[in-house]
Amino acid sequence: MIKHSLSDCLADPDHLIRIKSYVEANVRFLGLSLVTLLVTIQMFRALGSPLRLNKPLVGRRSILEPRWLVGLRFTKGGRELLRQAYKKYKDEIFKVQCNDTEICVLPHRYVEELRGLPASKVSSPQALYNKGLGSYTGLEVIVESHLHFQAIQGHLTPNLASALGIVLDELQDALKTVLPDCSDEWVPFDVHTVLSELVSRLSSRVFGGLELARNQQWIQLSTAYPRNAFACTMALRMVPRIIRPLLAAVLPTYWRTRSNIRDAKRIVGGIITKRRADEGATDMSAKEHPCDLLQWMMNAAAGTETHADDLAHRLLFISDASVMTTSLLISHCLYDLVAHPEALSCIREEVHNVLREGDNFQKTTLHKMRSLDSALKESQRLNPPFLMTFDRVVREPLLLSDGTQIPVGTHLAMPTDAMLQDSSLLPQGGVAPDQFDPFRYARAREDPENAQRFQLATTEAKSLVFGHGKHACPGRFFASSEAKIILSHLLLLYDFRYPEGKGRPESWLFSENVAIDPNARLLIKKRNDAASNLAMLAKAL
């Protein structure tokens, strides 16, 4: 049959032409049908569902362009896209597509209106959970209750003076073991890795006591967990939701993240068990009773919060936030100051003069270090950890004061990085917004009306790195004080410079995140006057 048909075709050229025309027509029809289907799908997506806010989506080159491609472009160039969008829509609402999430970006005039809304209307923890893919990275505890938030706000901040004393005590030992030996020569200094371990040591002492701070496995996992969780989140957000369980099953960082959480529960769980066994002891002096964040959470916990696994999980989350943000803050500032040696010398002199007056390292002493505070805030301005902050997820239909209706499920945020480049929102005077001016905020505070403004830990509608309102970062006062203590010690005890031919490293940008270049290095050498400065620092304990 086949041979016969083939011979017929060869004998009749017109028959071949008819077959060829038939195939071409069907291919064209199938191609046209496929294109029509894709166009229809994209048009429906572009028009959006009734629950999608009808505002301009920046970064989209065509209404036919798929959202995943827009999100991919944001992953690589989010900072520039947000800054350009801010210039165009500064006083308007616009949207950006971040991988899997459409974010509604609001002008800062809405901050005061939104900050007071109840959690039943807008949720900050839910926004963090969604962005961090909490079901994969273990963020369930932050939406189940606010025990950790309340413990920091109600106990750590009011007891900041005693917490700083603990930080200083732990720092004396940590400097000997964490920093490289550089007494006689310049040696390479892995800034972010070393500072992450240093911050983990100091914070862990305040969060869970001496036993936790000296547990090397805890220190390792408290610095590894943020890296693994971040890498896991970024990988999973690149693929559709339906594929995520399959990808997670073969993703090494997912399994490392879960392993970090299990190890944290084992380590902290052991401490909790021992403390509960000691609670009934009558021979313990008041001095022996634990006084740290873990104990404050244990005392206030109720229901499922009392479970050791729950408490340990919360402590790991707090450590994650502390280590990541504080080490980034100090690293960026150190890089900036080493690139501006005159400013570094001025700040070193300020720290020296304040401590030479005989003041102890307390909150009032740190307040006197205005140039150091200003340099940290300026460095943070140029390299905030996130391009957008003040994140909220709308839980109930929201009607803003100007009549704007926000649908349920909308993810709201503020363009923090772009706002920090807006000269109209910065203190008057100083160099251009894109330049590092270490004394920008110190000069502004010379005006008596601004004496309590423009500090690293203060928040306002124009400065949202730590958020603003009742959901602002509760640990910012501890973090800013810890950063100043660490940096002041480093400046008094060590000299720093860039390797030959190197300069201030560019930050790594990935989606909404601003990170340190992990390959960047400084050179470090102990100062000639380190011994006398160390003695002065010891008197300030």
From Swiss-Prot:
EC numbers, comma separated: 1.-.-.-
Needed cofactors: heme
Protein's UniProt keywords contain S-adenosyl-L-methionine: no
Positions annotated to bind heme: C473
GO MF, one annotated term: monooxygenase activity
Highest taxon of the lineage: Eukaryota
Biological process terms in GO annotation: secondary metabolic process
SUPFAM superfamilies xrefs: Cytochrome P450
Keywords attached to this entry: Heme, Iron, Metal-binding, Monooxygenase, Oxidoreductase
Pathway participation: Mycotoxin biosynthesis
Keyword Metal-binding: yes
Functional note: Geranylgeranyl pyrophosphate synthase; part of the gene cluster that mediates the biosynthesis of aphidicolin, a specific inhibitor of eukaryotic DNA synthesis and DNA polymerase alpha. The geranylgeranyl pyrophosphate synthase GGS is required for supplying a sufficient amount of geranylgeranyl diphosphate (GGDP), the general precursor of diterpenes. The diterpene synthase ACS then catalyzes the conversion of geranylgeranyl diphosphate to aphidicolan-16-beta-ol via the intermediate syn-copalyldiphosphate (syn-CDP).
Family: Belongs to the cytochrome P450 family.
Designated name of the protein: Cytochrome P450 monooxygenase 2
UniProt source species: Neocamarosporium betae
